[in-house]
Amino acid sequence: MKFTLSWLKDHLDTDASVDEIAEALTDLGLEVEEIVNPADRLAGFTLGHVKHAEKHPDADKLRVCTVETDEGDLQIICGAPNAREGITVVVCKPGMYIPGLDITISVGKIRGVESFGMMASERELELSDEHDGIIELPSGEVGDRFVDWLAENDPSKVDPMIEIAITPNRPDALGVAGIARDLAARGLGTLKVRDYTPVPGDFESPIKVSIDEDTLDGAPHFTGRLIRGVKNGPSPQWLQDQLKAIGLRPISALVDITNYMTFDHNRPLHVFDADKVQGNLRVHRAKGGEKLVALDEKEYSLQPGMMVISDDKGPESIAGIMGGEETGCTEETVNVFLESAFWDHVQIALTGRALKINSDARYRFERGVDPEYTREGLEHATQMILDICGGEASNVVEAGKAPNHARAYKLDAARVQSLVGMEIPESEQRQTLTRLGFRLDGEMAHVPSWRPDIMGEADLVEEVARIASLTKLQGIPLPRTTAGIPKPVMTPTQRRQSMARRTCAALGYNECVSYTFIDQASAALFGGGDAATMLENPISSEMSHMRPDLLPGLLQAAARNQARGYADLALFEVGPVFHDGEPGDQQTQITGLLVGRSGPKDVHGASRPVDLFDAKADAEAVLAAIGAPAKVQILRGGDAWWHPGRHGKICLGPKKVLGVFGELHPRVLQALDIKGPAMAFTIWSDQVPMPRKSGATRSALELRDLQAVERDFAFVVNADIEALTLVNAAAGADKALIEDVRVFDEFIGGSVGEGKKSLAITVRLQPSDATLKEKDIEAVSTKIVEKVMKATGGVLRG
């Protein structure tokens, strides 16, 4: 929406500057996108007086002028036919930028004679398209600023243009009057209310109007009148200047008046050449297939149900969007029929979209115009036509009636504080709404017809707060029920996820955020892809199922990176996975993926391919960071997408699985186009028990002053016996005394025998109340041997 400062002042009595108005508009929600101030580009130009002018010695059409300026006399070569002695001109001195030519003037020689500047035409200063000669001013002193002369003698030439962005909920701001109303409510001036004086008719209109019954829902109200004896010449200069300033080309008085009403009061109108209309006008729905050449000289084929205005010949206008060329006005037009109607915004939008027509009328009708201004807008436009074009008006013809959108909501002054947090006195709230056009009746606020966005009490609060300025909103801490240390902002689960992200990043991983939707084939590779997780209305076939695991998204990201030459990758993601369609079947995963080598090439040693122990170490680091117990077990038996024999489950006890680490199955990597082996870890953070709540104080560190004792044992067991089985058996011999059990050696072959292996462990004994004696150590050692032999079937190696 564009308008000029002078246009705004037609509706607002204000002394505010352009900057103050722009700041207020943005604060009111009408964001200023651009300000074009002609005074800025004209600030350096000054007035000069041509003291002498003579023919150029080497060019018939050039004159050598001596121009008096504020910096002394300058010799300027000029080719304008009106360059002569005694005139006041606009001087462009060397070093100045000429906007119309897009050059910076400099001292130069023209046909051997030096020129120290130029005298400007209106086109060269972007004041108009006039370039038949240089600017001649009837007044002004040498050295005066040209912009000051324009401000006093021709202010339209330096009228600032403001462009604002209009949100869909504010159609009232598509008229300058609506913008002025907001500024007046803010306190930047006083709104000038235009008097509504109906224009009396001098005769009955020969053209009548009717609306078909099935069209009343889309065209509830139509008004019009015939004006005869008009003269459709150029519009007045003030009207042309205002339209030019906002980028519209003046066409004729009648067209310019309708354009003016569109931007001035958000009231689109249409003017028919009454002598070209045959019979009466009828508003109805198209049957389909009708043709109409519109004012843009394009032919449109109407679809069934579109609203049109027809005479006895056929369609003459696409209702609310664009008129027809056949009944359009020309310079020869003498009698016109002026239309002002209200159209349903949804049907206008559908028709405009189907026909691919973008017009100012469509833009406004599909957002909503004031239904109660239909008749009043007709009267205002009629008066403008009579004032500018002459003629006499008929009585108004009318079909239908304005739809009743009246509504009222209770104004609760306390809700401004509860909803927005601003303390605004009730008297100020009522004054604000009154200035915005609301009618107050006790506690009820009646919404003005031009505000379709006000649909409840909360909207009243928003209007009050908007006019008061949300920039004045002060931060107020939320009340606390208990004093002391502030409660944490994040929940324990959120803190755990945040810590997991920080830890993975510290380990050198890059975070990925992938879609929770994946294709069925990828989901099936990881135990999903069934009907329970299938979307009813997927975005695409590649997003048909909820993901059962984070690994598909990470592997797809890795494949895309490998395709672009990035072979060494460390990626992680924290997010939800879905095993069924019910809310309880959602879990949170922490997953990391390693592909390629452990690091870049280095002169101090070759990098190595990543292996499962890298994934194991990273998984243990993440578990430790999120508070998992230190004593966990590594067991076999992962899912089918893990490489058999090259992965392990991290368990808390024999059944509670906290995570998995290892190498991914080659079949999965091939299906997802991953080159080379890939290591990964997956942690189910929901399975990691939350740490117990601790009190305000911590117990003192307990340091035992008794000497610990370590004993080594070697056992010969079957080759398929896991080391963990042996460790758990040894640790269970005396849980109070045995502090730690570690495997330190494995031997296969030789004297051990076929199908056997030797596992050596170190057992650390830590007494708590007395130093261990030899008999105590021997007793524990005997229990350890018995426990291990019973659990593994092995023997103590001699």
Q: What are the residue ranges of the model-derived segments?
A:
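Glycine/proline-enriched, intrinsically flexible loops and inter-domain linkers
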Residues: L5, E23, L28, R63, ...
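Terminal amphipathic helices with adjacent charged low-complexity linkers/tails
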Residues: L183, G187-E213, C389-V416, E423, ...
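Extended, well-folded interaction surfaces typified by the phenylalanyl-tRNA synthetase beta subunit core
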Residues: G178, Y409-F572, R764-Q766, D776-G798
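Conserved mixed alpha/beta core segments that line enzyme active sites in large multi-domain catalysts
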Residues: L47-I77, D241, T258-E326
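Mobile "lid/hinge" segments at catalytic clefts and subdomain interfaces of large enzymes
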Residues: R111-E124, E130-E136, G143, S156, ...
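Beta-rich nucleic-acid/ligand-interaction surfaces
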Residues: A39-A43, P198-P200, M261, T482-I485, ...
